[in-house]
């Protein structure tokens, strides 16, 4: 049951990092620091990367025309098999870097796993596997599977035995359990990827799992690691897995604000939050909204209250069975519901393209969690709005930490907000 314990740990985000110092100056060639103004769209197109026609067709189907800054910097080297260590803001398309780079290079061999991608939560693993399916749409010979705790390991073992995937996405606990049961063979892995790598490498037990898995893969392979937050303490740990990696840090790490995202706070008592939330949902224009709360109980109660007030809400929290969480996540992603109430479980790495407003109904516990929550709105260079409720001195302190660390001014919510500042106008 050891892997179950690891999996359960993955569900909560204990964001206890120290505020990050500006980027270290230790030389580690080749390194790219992409600073200056935040330009999310480059004039070059995906065609410039000379990708397979099947990939280009899938990219067109997804509606992407130009690579983001991080894609522009990473993809040309990544598709050549170079090791990559990349830190870039949430919502800038890091996932597509390793999905496209690995699919570009993959030469599927029946019965062999070529690509191993690991991340720290089940939901993120599920989402990454969906991205692989989306981009490999015109590559029918490429098989993708996702493995994580909370679901029957027997089913996973059957999949590996009867229909061995070329791309495996999963959480470290379940991957290690499958390796130990001799169901998963990693001897042919050519690409080893960690997404939100800091989350896995900061927790010592999870780092041990990752290291054990890493040692079971061939010495000659490509290693890529990505995260929105990479403290200077964790970077040397990442480098130990790599050989002369290309390091890409998009923008200064203290300035992890998101282009196009309007950020405001509202000062009020805890007892006034519901009324204020309902008022704002009435007056603001939104495609989809995520409301973050601090506990399962508050999540369930608020979702119920919203439904009673005729707001189409759905809840996701860590008290739910795994299948139920994934089903609800998919419902929200498919636009069946427009309002999602969630705990931190949902806060990191989740990608819902239509979300343009995030509410911190309860203040996140620290500045990192704040970043990963508000990054749900305004992803991939689009506009968005983040509203944070401040109800006591501790809330105010955390908001000050956010402003100091990310060098951003979070102003008090004005009486009226120009709709064009937080929602894309249809052309």
Curated annotation (Swiss-Prot):
GO cellular component: cytoplasm; nuclear speck
N6-acetyllysine PTM sites in chain numbering: 35
GO molecular function, one term: RNA binding
Predominant localisation class: nucleus
Short sequence motif named DECD box, residue ranges: 195-198
Region called Disordered, residue ranges: 1-36
Modified residues (N-acetylalanine): 2
Residue positions of motif Q motif: 44-72
GO term, biological process aspect, one: negative regulation of innate immune response
Pfam families: DEAD (PF00270), Helicase_C (PF00271)
Post-translational modifications reported in the UniProt record: SUMOylated by RANBP2; SUMOylation modification affects its ability to bind RNA.
SMART domains: DEXDc, HELICc
Catalytic activity, EC: 3.6.4.13
List of residues that carry Phosphoserine: 37, 426
PANTHER family per record: ATP-DEPENDENT RNA HELICASE DBP3
Family recorded in the similarity comment: Belongs to the DEAD box helicase family. DECD subfamily.
Quaternary structure and partners: Binds ALYREF/THOC4 and DDX39B/BAT1. Interacts with the apo-AREX complex component SARNP. Interacts with MX1. Interacts with MCM3AP isoform GANP. Interacts with ECD. Interacts with PHAX; this interaction stimulates PHAX RNA binding activity.
Protein's job: Helicase that plays an essential role in mRNA export and is involved in multiple steps in RNA metabolism including alternative splicing. Regulates nuclear mRNA export to the cytoplasm through association with ECD. Also involved in spliceosomal uridine-rich small nuclear RNA (U snRNA) export by stimulating the RNA binding of adapter PHAX. Plays a role in the negative regulation of type I IFN production by increasing the nuclear retention of antiviral transcripts and thus reducing their protein expression.
Protein name, entry field: ATP-dependent RNA helicase DDX39A
Protein's organism: Mus musculus
Gene name of the record: Ddx39a
